[in-house]
Every structure is written in structure tokens, then in C-alpha cells.
A protein has these predicted regions:
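Non-heme di-metal
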Residues: 1-209
């Protein structure tokens, strides 16, 4: 169960209208490395985590990604809400406007609609966590590219920098989860080997005479 607060995790106060920037930023809403894919991936993977700590980490990060989704949606909305038809057409958003107006629709910067194929739930704990580490690095790299593209709009860059920093924190927390799971698996394997050991293997019945 979640408790919703009617405030963004970090303020988004954009004064300019720039649908051209919205066209690329929307990739972090519904693109392959975006916040929607991340939130669904982590919240789905959490069920199979082997202990409460790793489940809590995925639950926490998946929940925060929903907050980031809201932030990205707010950025896109504020960049387009007052755009004229001419500005929309000039930004190359004529097809988008035809289907969605200025609603925030989950798609990539290239216009590819969101798909569940972006999720990674492999049925292998280590593989899932390795995927999560890679996902955070890809998201960080995407935010860095967006910051470069938005360099002349400080109101846009500010929340993007915040989101980039959170991806770094998430990467560190997934590393913590992976180390914990690997330690538990190694410990389990050690005890299984001990349980399967024959008495003669430990030398307990050896006769010194």
C-alpha cells in the first residue's frame, strides 16, 4: 500500500515553452531506459527476492521511480502546455499531437510506444539484479545526454540533475542488494556441502593406530 503526497519529490518549475525538448525528455517517461520501465521492473522483481532486505530495496527504489515518473511527466507537460500549433509542428510533434494532443503519453524519443518488453524479469535473482545495475547506469547516461541537450534552459536542467543523481544512488543500493544475495547464496552452498559430506570425509572415524 502506498501513501500519495500531492507534491513532487523535487520541484519542477519550468517557465519556458519548448516542445522540442519535451520530445526528447519524454523518453525518460516511456522509453526503454525510462522511469515507467524501471518502476515496473523493480516492483515485479521484488516478489522473488530471497530475503526481506533485498525485497525492501527493490520496493523502495521501484516506488521512488514512480515519483520520478511523475516528475518527468510534469517536465514534459510544462514544456508543452502552452505550445502553439506552429511550435508543435516545428518540434516534429505533429504526429504525436494528432494522436495525443498535449497529453503525456509513454513513448521513447523516437516515438516508439512503451512496451512490456522493456522489463527484465528473468527468474534468476543474480541476473535480475545485474540487469538492475545496468538499467541504472543506462538511465544515468540518458539523463546526462538530456542535460547536454537542455543546457540553455536552467529550469529544465535542475530537475534533470536531481534525477541523474538519484540513479547513482540507486546503482549503489542495487550493488548492496547484489552483494547481500551473493553472500547468502554462498553461505547456503557451504552448508549444503557440509550436510552432504560423508562421515569418512571429515576424518572422524579414522583410526590413528
Amino acid at each position: 500500500m502506498w501513501t500519495y503526497k500531492k507534491t513532487l519529490q523535487y520541484p519542477v518549475n519550468i517557465k519556458c515553452t519548448n516542445p522540442k525538448l519535451a520530445k526528447v525528455i519524454i523518453s525518460q517517461y516511456g522509453g526503454p531506459d525510462g522511469e515507467l520501465a524501471a518502476s515496473l521492473r523493480y516492483l515485479s522483481q521484488r516478489f522473488a527476492m530471497p530475503d526481506q532486505k533485498s525485497k525492501a530495496i527493490l520496493n523502495d527504489i521501484g516506488t521512488e521511480e514512480l515519483a520520478h515518473l511523475e516528475m518527468v511527466g510534469s517536465i514534459v507537460h510544462q514544456l508543452t502546455k502552452n505550445a502553439s500549433i506552429e511550435e508543435i509542428e516545428k518540434a516534429g510533434l505533429g504526429a504525436y499531437y494528432t494522436d495525443h494532443g498535449v497529453d503525456v503519453y509513454p513513448q521513447s524519443a523516437a516515438g516508439v510506444p512503451f512496451t512490456a518488453a522493456y522489463l527484465a524479469c528473468k527468474g534468476d535473482i543474480i541476473a535480475n539484479l545485474q540487469e538492475d545495475l545496468a538499467a541504472e547506469q543506462k538511465a544515468r547516461a540518458t539523463y546526462e545526454k538530456l542535460i547536454d541537450l537542455c543546457r540553455d534552459e536552467p529550469d529544465v536542467v535542475d530537475p534533470l540533475r536531481y534525477l541523474r543523481q538519484r540513479e547513482i544512488v540507486h546503482f549503489q543500493r542495487f550493488g548492496e542488494a547484489l552483494r547481500g544475495v551473493q553472500d547468502k547464496l554462498a553461505e547456503k552452498k557451504f552448508y549444503m556441502n557440509c550436510d552432504n559430506m560423508q562421515t569418512s570425509d571429515c576424518g572422524c572415524n579414522n583410526n590413528d593406530n
